[in-house]
Design a protein with these regions (language model features):
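Solvent-exposed interaction patches of small proteins and small membrane subunits
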Residues: 1-98
């Protein structure tokens, strides 16, 4: 497994571990603000992982498709991807400044 895949898998396993902890918190009737804080942390981890996966897709598959003259096809694919997760573009300074 290459470095990119290791990073993504590790981040997902970390998020899963946090979710398991949140489940225990709910089962033990923990204080709601503490649960919300942990949920927010997991959401942040998943959003960061989503951005990393999207960036990898841009740097590999999209760049390759553009070089191969399949720009229209890849634009359609990207539009479809963004339809499901618009947050992927959030909090990226280069995009926010445009």
């Amino acid at each position: 497994m290459d470095e990119y895949h290791r990073r993504v898998v590790n981040r997902l396993k970390t998020a899963r571990g946090h979710l398991d902890g949140i489940v225990r918190m709910v089962e033990e009737d923990a204080w709601c603000p503490d649960i919300m804080k942990q949920l927010s942390a997991v959401q942040g981890m998943l959003e960061g992982t989503s951005r990393e996966v999207f960036r990898h897709h841009l740097e590999t598959h999209v760049a390759e498709a553009v070089r191969a003259g399949r720009a229209e096809e890849i634009v359609d694919e990207l539009m479809e991807t963004l339809k499901y997760d618009k947050r992927v573009l959030r909090a990226i300074p280069e995009v926010d400044e445009i």
